[in-house]
Regions:
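A short, hydrophobic C-terminal helix/tail in secreted or cell-surface proteins
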Residues: 220-227
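A generic signature of intrinsically disordered, low-complexity regions enriched in glycine/proline
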Residues: 21-23, 100, 222
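A gly/proline- and charged-residue-enriched helix-loop-helix capping module
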Residues: 16-30
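N-terminal secretory/targeting leader peptides
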Residues: 1-16, 31-219
Length: 227
């Protein structure tokens, strides 16, 4: 699932905020999945998404000059980028590495752990030091299969799935910074932004809200949280 990442680009910057918001919209996401024939056993974040690029970028204008990888089959996201003035290139994940090598794409939003594991950083040598969004994943099972499972076993499966998901999430959160440091040792350039440049990105995201078919931008964080 990429729902949280699509809805909340740049809006929240702490894991506590993401946990709060996910709790608020989880029921909608789960029911939406069931309408599409799948049962969600657990839902966790995979990590913060950053921009990894072949060329150095600092502003949305810089990104508009790049060729952005988007998920193959995710036509809504590709259309969103296109309408915002960017150059999306839909590709299947297995084609990302070869497409980076040939220059078909040269910009991609991914969590650092994923970039490190696939060694994309050998080509995309620049990371924009800005949390772009959160990548969310879910463990699912076909709803018809789920409905054939006895309730007592369903309960056990849900419990085990939640425990495994939480452990996976905690490990990812701990190892994220380590992945960036490892890539820096191999030549990754982490590019910081000025306040003015950060504001440009925030303005861009706000301008894209009307283009998003389903939005939860009315939700707010509790006053004790920091943004």
């Amino acid at each position: 699932s990429r729902g949280l990442g699509d809805v909340y680009k740049r809006q929240f910057q702490e894991y506590e905020d993401i946990d709060f918001i996910r709790d608020q919209i989880k029921e909608d996401l789960v029911s939406g999945a069931e309408k599409n024939g799948v049962k969600v056993l657990t839902m966790v974040d995979v990590g913060w998404v950053y921009w990894f690029t072949t060329n150095t970028i600092h502003t949305p204008k810089d990104l508009k000059e790049q060729k952005i990888w988007t998920w193959a089959g995710d036509y809504k996201t590709a259309k969103l980028w296109d309408e915002a003035g960017f150059n999306p290139i839909p590709l299947a994940v297995p084609d990302v590495h070869s497409s980076l090598q040939t220059g078909l794409v040269n910009a991609m939003p991914f969590p650092p752990l994923y970039v490190a594991a696939n060694q994309y950083f050998g080509i995309t040598k620049n990371m924009l030091n800005m949390k772009w969004g959160i990548l969310t994943a879910a463990l699912v099972i076909d709803l018809k299969v789920w409905n054939r499972i006895k309730p007592k076993y369903q309960k056990v499966m849900m419990k085990v799935s939640e425990e495994i998901g939480l452990e996976y999430q905690l490990n990812n959160r701990k190892e994220e910074d380590e992945a960036v440091n490892v890539m820096k040792n191999y030549g990754l350039q982490v590019n910081n932004l000025s306040k003015e440049q950060i504001n440009e990105w925030n303005v861009l995201v706000e301008s894209m809200y009307p283009l998003i078919p389903v939005s939860y931008t009315h939700l707010t964080l509790p006053t004790t949280s920091s943004v």
